Amino acid sequence: MKGIAGREIRGLPLGANIVCADNTGARSISLIDVKAYHGKARRIPAAGVGDMFIASVKKGTPEMRSKVVYAVVIRQKRPYRRPDGTMVEFEDNAAVLVTPDGEVRGSEIKGPVAREAAERWPRIAAIASIIV
């Protein structure tokens, strides 16, 4: 995992329902906790593009349902600004399931992946079909 440059806009608070964009068997996950989040007292933790978080599988195959998993955000609806001034926003909030070490659990990713997530997680960039 590499560091992320600049100010990050975190658009996914605790409890957010997120589409799972890989072929692991999970279809929808709910955000439980954000890894390495250092916030302010009584502020609800939130995740942004490229952040690793802990989630619960809400919809999916019977083996995957109600499991606690690690995931990385690859798309978010909330617009954010890149250092070159462009604003980026996606149609949905999406994540891919990973191991606690950052290895991707699936073998393919559906839809585009944000450049910030691809730069931070080389394993995600390796299997991404589109990087925006």
Swiss-Prot record:
SUPFAM superfamilies (UniProt xref): Ribosomal protein L14
Keyword check for RNA-binding: yes
Gene3D superfamilies the UniProt entry points to: Ribosomal protein L14
Keywords, alphabetical: Ribonucleoprotein, Ribosomal protein, RNA-binding, rRNA-binding
One BP annotation, GO: translation
Annotated InterPro entries: Ribosomal_uL14, Ribosomal_uL14_arc, Ribosomal_uL14_CS, Ribosomal_uL14_sf
Domain of life: Archaea
GO function terms (MF aspect): large ribosomal subunit rRNA binding; structural constituent of ribosome
Xref: SMART domains: Ribosomal_L14
GO cellular component, one term: cytosolic large ribosomal subunit
Subunit structure, interactors included: Part of the 50S ribosomal subunit. Forms a cluster with proteins L3 and L24e, part of which may contact the 16S rRNA in 2 intersubunit bridges.
Function: Binds to 23S rRNA. Forms part of two intersubunit bridges in the 70S ribosome.
Family: Belongs to the universal ribosomal protein uL14 family.
Protein name per UniProt: Large ribosomal subunit protein uL14
Organism per entry: Thermoplasma volcanium (strain ATCC 51530 / DSM 4299 / JCM 9571 / NBRC 15438 / GSS1)
Gene name as annotated: rpl14
